[in-house]
């Protein structure tokens, strides 16, 4: 006999259910269940996932909800008794009613507060939405069982009768047996009531975990939820029988108190319930919202009118007859396609909210992704990119030969994104708009610590174990891997194997690893519906009160709902802020959208006239790009890109677009970048395999760069329609042999008809195929949002709908759904070993992200010994990584480190796979490596527009742009320092914060920039607003003293810590220069100010406080000073310079008073140290010296031979640079590798990943550096005999390889003047004393001299 589980909780019963749906369904099938119901507590989070997981499997999904029912008004939050009630959807109508009830309970029926809050309904709602529902009496928490337990059988009958009357045969009494006395009592009486009222009984097991082996782990989960220890007696605990039971196990229950025939019937009735449930048809066609159309219009005619009017405006034509045929025909074609595919209303919805943004001054991006290929979108000002001019293809956006929803993602200013959500909410109705939920799962590190806490294991112990788990590039290793023979950390496994208590702890954690812990909100997605959402998806409120769906993004889209991505981007905020500052300081109104058009116009004029002149603003922009001054320039900031841009010398947006596609993910080998550059500058001949290719490839100098070029080749050479060409592009991705053969034959046949020799046509087709031929092997695991790590071969072969993690151009991690699944046939696969112990299995040309954000072929990374980007400690469980487009940079999402590829081996020919993505074309593997795939021209052109806008503003309005950039970077001290250094190079001074002048943002002051308060640590928005408001409201519009400040501001908002930070950052220097004194005064001043504030509140004012504002301020001050002196502590000395500098660096990220190396640099000039920022001016392997502070020291153990080495971050007065100490020198130098120390460094210039660094050969604390000083006359210098003797002595004291090298300097006395000559390194010596003694013995005036004068301290 079979059995159907009708009372099942998954991990969507957050921190109560431990069953993940895929494993749960697999186990149910294994147990022979023909169906299964999902009844999570009060929510329907997993309903659509349940349908997806069960699809194609021999099990029927039943959507349900274990709801909470009260007797009373659900909108009045009283201490109502809450009763459990299992509600199942019998059919589509039942699903709709269940959605309605779930939504009402979550939006209006929350009873209780905090962790005790529950979403509730009442019987009136059940009466209203009863149709299509099956209801059971639930567990011991149900109203009927509760009445029985209280001994009130009459009330129990009454309640059961009410449900029977309402639901008829769709009401069942539910018996459970978890071994308690209460279960037996309730079951016996339920059977009696059932017989009396003719109600059927169903047997259930209240399942919260899958296996009986999960009991302890589930108990730990409950303790994590409630914050209790497992050892505590008074806490929530289950019986341990709440697992998924088989039919056989169910038959063994109830026998001690119920007859066999009752048990048999109750189990059989579970099948009856399952049979009643019809297949749901809730996943459906697109539900595009209704857009209000003006009278006498249809959506089609309205779009047509807007588009034509927009095109006339764009092209500056008066009549349609004036429009050139290429635009006219393209627009007519696109409008026909939109009408045919039914997407005109969709375009109106997007047009409307973008129009609202533009009309209200909300910055909007120029376009994103393939939408930039639509002329209709350009005409309607949805995008600002002319697809005709740029050769973009509509079919990359919408293909009539494969109907799918368009996807127009829109970038808005991050500060005003919420306004856009509010607008569409008001436009379409609160009941039709919602944001989207996300779920945060428990990763190995997090679950290990959580379980440790409930087991009362000390934090230090759990932290130590958690730190052993490698989290390289995105995902902590699973605990099962950590205890396996393939463990990346043997010590972790050894403790698991040898310490029983550690084994118990880890085994418990393994059982709940990966379960849902909390929910969050999708950072971009907004759902807009044509009908009330509560008829389609269950809704709830987020913690901030916003309405969100209970289904995550992919499930919402599967329902046919329109999901819009409202992306909040800092970059747009920076641009808008810069434009506003230009208007304020220069009185010039700039139109960002017009800047690329003005460049295009200037280039067209130059091409037409043959003139070499360009307008000054365009010329400045191009010069900035050529110079490689690219800090703060969108997409071009990496070291590698800077060099490429310098070499390329872009002459327009087209060049920028091409280089973005070449450098970032794309189809080309890295070696094609030099070819592209050389062809542009005429150093290499541009050649085409056939003349028909010239118009397609001429803008990229004959180099195949974009997917669109493949489509055009198919169209122009082989007579494909663009729709067919898009299918060809997709087919090349899937690489199915039969399909590819058909396309090959068609392409070659069509090409030969156009006079292309078949040999060339075959070659071209092969080139196009190779365009997408970098792939991963079957077993390579990709990190998916829904299921964790999955083999790419499984994802592709089963076309699993899931999302992956990607990195956007601003370095932020977000999620996006897989759009295409590519089986690329067979090819050689190599296994690349990383120094952290993980491996990557891929074709040699698959691209991965390096530490300076280059995407390079893995083989090149290995060959050049470059570093892969590594992300550690991703905050996935803290409502972060699962969110679409995270509101923080990659650097803040986790800890970046470098990992080398240390080995490789061939795995032979294997089947290979890849995936297609709608936005940024990269994704995280399960071991965290960031892999890449193809790039399209629409995407890179859209990026190129923003790149040009940022370059234009920096070149023409540098102070305003850098002020805006610093403001946008206020939340990152590292970025503030980076851009401040760039300001310094540009001759722009960034002045320190000033309590009387600084605003919230960085502000231009002539040719300088005043530090913004938002970038000072420990100052929240409230404190900043309070300071500025108090200052503006004061009589003198300034603070006269620390005491004046403390009396003017609300000290509850601007707390002591904030004031201390302002003092240490130098913000009070304008009122009192002794920072140490201010810190000593602060406690007294705060107490005094608080006392005055209290007296003011109670009316106990000093008589002089009552003087009117019109009276003499001096008289008032004199009076108050006479009677109530501002307090101060006994005088103290000011901090030393080094102490002040250290505090400035800590609180601002840079030095204000002066750089700590200023005096050191002056003394060290004898040794000719270089500026770190000038490393790229020296030859690779050239020996140099530098004076620098060790900002960061990261010591590692090499995996290859277990030897220690170190990576350093150095800083001098010019900026920062990286350095490395290899094992050969590490042991000798390790004692002086101290963070914060000032060192004299000797080493060689190195270039890795197109970034220059130092290979350290020697270093010494600057205060310990000594020189051998030789006093010589000009005659002695000129004497060849003297030279020979000097050479002989110095070389006799030459240091061996491992010895310290001591500089030798000659002081040339020429009368009253002296000058110094530093001997070359070949003449440096190995020992101070013996070298000086030898020189003195031969009559030379030699002495030992410290680098720094004795009076000079480095603190």
UniProtKB/Swiss-Prot annotation:
GO terms for cellular component: cytoplasm. SUPFAM superfamilies: Hedgehog/intein (Hint) domain, PHP domain-like. Pfam families: DNA_pol3_alpha, DNA_pol3_finger, HHH_6, PHP, tRNA_anti-codon. It catalyses: DNA(n) + a 2'-deoxyribonucleoside 5'-triphosphate = DNA(n+1) + diphosphate. Keywords: Autocatalytic cleavage, Cytoplasm, DNA replication, DNA-directed DNA polymerase, Nucleotidyltransferase, Protein splicing, Transferase. Transmembrane segments: none annotated. Its main location: cytoplasm. DNA polymerase III contains a core (composed of alpha, epsilon and theta chains) that associates with a tau subunit. This core dimerizes to form the PolIII' complex. PolIII' associates with the gamma complex (composed of gamma, delta, delta', psi and chi chains) and with the beta chain to form the complete DNA polymerase III complex. This is DNA polymerase III subunit alpha. It comes from Synechocystis sp. (strain ATCC 27184 / PCC 6803 / Kazusa).
